[in-house]
């Protein structure tokens, strides 16, 4: 059952859900500003590959990386975690 949920991108793991939510927020903000991953990478100093992995919740981001991303997208850190 657990692997069936994982294949559908669902999980009972709150940490995995948080990573997905953060990644989704970053991707939505980036796209709403019409930025490519490459452009965001230049603004943050992070690699395109790492940014892509964060957006897809395949890699967790450090606080430092999240700060760079939030700053580049003109977001408050709280917004990455679902705060208004």
Language-model-derived ranges and their functions:
Residues 40, 65-73, 79-81:
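Hydrophobic micro-packing sites on short alpha-helices
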Residues 6-32:
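A short, Lys/Arg-rich alpha-helix, primarily the initiator
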Residues 25, 36, 62-65, 76:
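Residues that mark the N-terminal boundary/hinge immediately upstream of a DNA-recognition element
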Residues 34-53:
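Short alpha-helical DNA-recognition segment
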